[in-house]
Amino acid sequence: MRRDERWDGVYSFEDSPFIMEILTELRDKNTDSIAFRKGLVKLGRYMGYELTKTMDVEEIEVETPLEKTRGILVKDRRNVVIITVLRAAIPLMEGLIKVFEHARVGIVSASRGKAPKFEIEMNYIKIPTVKPDDTVIVADPMIATGSTLIRVLKEVSKYGRPKRLIILGVLAAPEGISRIKEAFPEAEIFVAKVDRELNEKGYILPGLGDAGDRAFGAPLKSPR
């Protein structure tokens, strides 16, 4: 795990060869939907594992079949709320749940409009109550302009103030990170890698394309 010196509370996993290998497969335009979804699940699981290294632990006593000994309990792992941004984050959440099996789950359906306005449409929100000792993890593979996540974080803040507010993604653009940190300076951001920039259409470069379309197929246009 590597802290990005450009911002406070922003971390990447560029020093993990395994995570970088999965990311490389996701970037490949020839990776099919099945492999793409599996890759997102694996990233959710392994980045979730890395997140536990930042959580509070407690030393406890445990009794083996032979004698008593000391061990640890990752306390925060049992107080997690995962917010999934449909639809691209579904596989990412599946991986996170394998690490945070006690997590309560919230679902937000949000979509970003086209350039230049990038207006955000939200039509479904189900978020559990957030408690003061909770760690909220908002899962969204692509942190591009940051508009979607800022809107989601505003909704999450209505349900309570957590101990920690974490955004977990696969790729991020510097522009999106800066906007999020300006709006929510307390938010911690963990991504596999911070990419170079956004293009004029709001896509991350070099990126991996539209994560939702690549995981689940491009949606049909509404018939007229």
UniProtKB/Swiss-Prot annotation:
One of its GO terms (biological process) is uracil salvage. One of its GO terms (molecular function) is magnesium ion binding. It catalyses: UMP + diphosphate = 5-phospho-alpha-D-ribose 1-diphosphate + uracil. SUPFAM superfamilies: PRTase-like. Uracil binds at residues 204, 209-211. GTP binds at residues 38-42. Its cofactor is Mg(2+). Its EC number is 2.4.2.9. Binds 1 Mg(2+) ion per subunit. The magnesium is bound as Mg-PRPP. Keywords: Allosteric enzyme, Glycosyltransferase, GTP-binding, Magnesium, Nucleotide-binding, Transferase. Allosterically activated by GTP. Pathway: Pyrimidine metabolism; UMP biosynthesis via salvage pathway; UMP from uracil: step 1/1. 5-phospho-alpha-D-ribose 1-diphosphate binds at residues 87, 112, 140-148, 210. InterPro entries: PRibTrfase_dom (IPR000836), PRTase-like (IPR029057), Upp_A (IPR034331), Ura_phspho_trans (IPR005765). Coiled coil: none annotated. HAMAP family: Upp_A (MF_01218_A). Belongs to the UPRTase family. NCBIfam families: PRK00129.1, upp. Catalyzes the conversion of uracil and 5-phospho-alpha-D-ribose 1-diphosphate (PRPP) to UMP and diphosphate. This is Uracil phosphoribosyltransferase. It comes from Thermococcus gammatolerans (strain DSM 15229 / JCM 11827 / EJ3). The lineage of its organism: Archaea, Methanobacteriati, Methanobacteriota, Thermococci, Thermococcales. The gene is upp.
